[in-house]
């Protein structure tokens, strides 16, 4: 994270525990939320990059200002891919790419709501993020 210049953009694949565990990962998470704008998390199905059972996310962030809102796209719930028999393809992420609105983040619209609980695209405020970590609920990746 230290080599990223102000305004630099990063996308990185990390296991869930980086977003939830204490100790060293908690310090990394705190620095990420304070020194970077972690604006998007793409939750991937289990076993896409690592051994079976390992849950992963793609984190998208920019260096410069602290995190205010995090948009989460849940591509994990109800989806199963395997590297051997049913690999994930670019087409599987078309809805995410559409929701992401590259260059037009102000145009993002949630697809998740109480009326549409199957929607995959949801925004969490800084207050919701802080509360989730204080209560250790894992709301962003549960």
Task: Cite the ranges covered by each PLM segment.
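A conserved structural/catalytic subdomain of Rossmann-like adenosyl-cofactor enzymes
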Residues: 1-142
């Amino acid at each position: 994270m230290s080599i990223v210049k102000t305004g630099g953009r990063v996308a990185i694949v990390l296991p869930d525990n980086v977003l939830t565990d204490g100790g060293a990962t908690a310090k990394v998470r705190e620095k990420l939320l304070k020194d970077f704008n972690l604006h998007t998390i793409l939750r991937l199905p289990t076993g896409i990059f690592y051994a079976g059972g390992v849950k992963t996310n793609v984190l998208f962030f920019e260096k410069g200002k602290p995190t205010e809102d995090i948009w989460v796209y849940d591509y994990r719930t109800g989806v199963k891919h395997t590297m051997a028999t049913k690999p994930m393809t670019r087409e599987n992420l078309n809805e995410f790419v559409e929701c992401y609105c590259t260059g037009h983040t102000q145009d993002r619209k949630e697809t998740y709501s109480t009326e549409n609980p199957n929607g995959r695209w949801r925004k969490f405020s800084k207050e919701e993020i802080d509360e989730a970590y204080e209560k250790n609920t894992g709301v962003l990746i549960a």
